[in-house]
């Protein structure tokens, strides 16, 4: 099985914050390493995972732009700086964000070259296994197979869909679509007052959207200290973001021109929200299907996470899983 196929000490599937760092560290320890990742942006490989491509990095770039706009609009005159009413060029703002993301992508590719890591741009998946390791297939820009003595699974997660409501990334948006809007929506609805919903709501509110957030939990950040929750709620209300808690979403309808959300409020009363765009941020789920895990018998728990022990070992010999694939906070620094 291995005679005409390149063999590596370690193959890492996924090049997000967990995957690319694992690959680099393994290479620094003297192991031969291959890292496989299928993310492509504008026809170019885009390692870095959700954090780099559609998460932490681009959201902070847009947050900085929106904060600067707000400062100029609302605070410049306090400093004796008088400007005409500032206007927003969203495409230029998005282009700046994309440039920052590309710089990060290219930085990771440089680190791979520096550490003599073989990078393959495509979907990595299990083909078969034997007593020596695992045959890994690659489909995408790079089409090949490699043999791994050890495997690190780091394919991350994807946004959770509302049942029966797919993301079209035009009117019904995940975090990815919300970071690529071509103009400021007049009305923006958000389902879920977690990190993603709050941050993106804050960005588009500063830029002029009327933002309304519906949250199933009875309060904002209920698992945080109560004082923090109160101060956060106060800050978001001062921005003018409308929040409603304790709601139950009954249906979401996209009629092409607007999105209609039917829900029950905290008192059980039927209500509706009509918006131009809707961001659904109700959590994320492990991105496991592309691995063809059943081929080798990888064990998952009842929620679809890869089962691991205290050292992140799976039920398969010499296979580890890290990051969003395993239980715990879905955070880049986990």
Tell me the role of every PLM-derived stretch:
Residues 3-18, 184-194:
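Beta1/beta-strand and adjacent pyrophosphate-binding region of the FAD-binding site
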Residues 14-19, 156, 192-197, 208, ...:
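Conserved phosphate-binding and hydrolysis motifs of nucleotide-dependent enzymes
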Residues 2-8, 24-184, 212, 217-221, ...:
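Glycine-rich flavin
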Residues 21, 161-163, 168, 199, ...:
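Glycine/Thr-rich phosphate-binding loops of Rossmann-like dinucleotide-binding domains
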Residues 168-184, 277-334:
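FAD-site-proximal beta/loop scaffold in flavoenzymes
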Residues 196-217, 238, 313-317, 324-327, ...:
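Active-site substrate-recognition segment that forms the wall
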Residues 10-35, 197-205:
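N-terminal Rossmann-like FAD-binding beta1-loop-alpha1 element of flavoenzymes
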């Amino acid at each position: 099985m291995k005679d005409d196929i390149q063999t590596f000490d370690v193959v890492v599937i996924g090049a997000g914050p967990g995957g690319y760092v694992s690959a680099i560290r393994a290479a620094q320890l003297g192991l031969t390493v291959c890292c496989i990742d299928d993310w492509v942006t504008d026809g170019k490989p885009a390692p870095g995972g959700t954090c780099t491509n559609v998460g932490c990095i681009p959201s902070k770039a847009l947050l900085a732009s929106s904060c600067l706009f707000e400062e100029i609009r609302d605070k410049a005159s306090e400093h004796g700086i008088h400007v005409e009413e500032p206007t927003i060029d969203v495409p230029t703002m998005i282009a700046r964000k994309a440039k920052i993301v590309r710089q990060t992508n290219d930085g990771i590719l440089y680190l791979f070259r520096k550490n003599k890591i073989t990078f393959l741009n495509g979907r990595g998946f299990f083909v078969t296994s034997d007593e020596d390791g695992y045959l890994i297939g690659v489909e995408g820009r790079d089409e090949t197979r490699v043999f791994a003595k050890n495997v690190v699974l780091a394919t991350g997660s994807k946004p959770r869909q509302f049942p029966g409501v797919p993301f079209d990334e035009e009117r019904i948006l995940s975090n990815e679509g919300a970071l690529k809007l071509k103009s400021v929506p007049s009305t923006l609805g958000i389902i879920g007052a977690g990190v993603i919903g709050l941050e993106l709501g804050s960005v588009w509110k500063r830029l002029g959207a009327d933002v309304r957030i519906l949250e199933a939990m009875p309060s904002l950040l209920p698992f945080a200290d109560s004082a923090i929750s109160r101060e956060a709620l106060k800050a978001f209300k001062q921005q003018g973001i409308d929040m409603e808690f304790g709601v139950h979403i009954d249906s979401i309808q996209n009629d092409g021109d607007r999105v209609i959300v039917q829900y029950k409020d905290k008192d059980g009363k039927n209500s509706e929200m009509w918006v131009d765009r809707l961001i659904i941020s109700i959590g994320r789920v492990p991105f496991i299907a592309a691995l063809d895990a059943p081929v080798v018998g990888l064990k998952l728990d009842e929620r679809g996470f890869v089962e691991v022990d205290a050292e992140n070992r799976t039920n398969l010999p010499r296979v580890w899983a890290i990051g969003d694939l395993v239980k715990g906070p879905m955070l880049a620094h986990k």
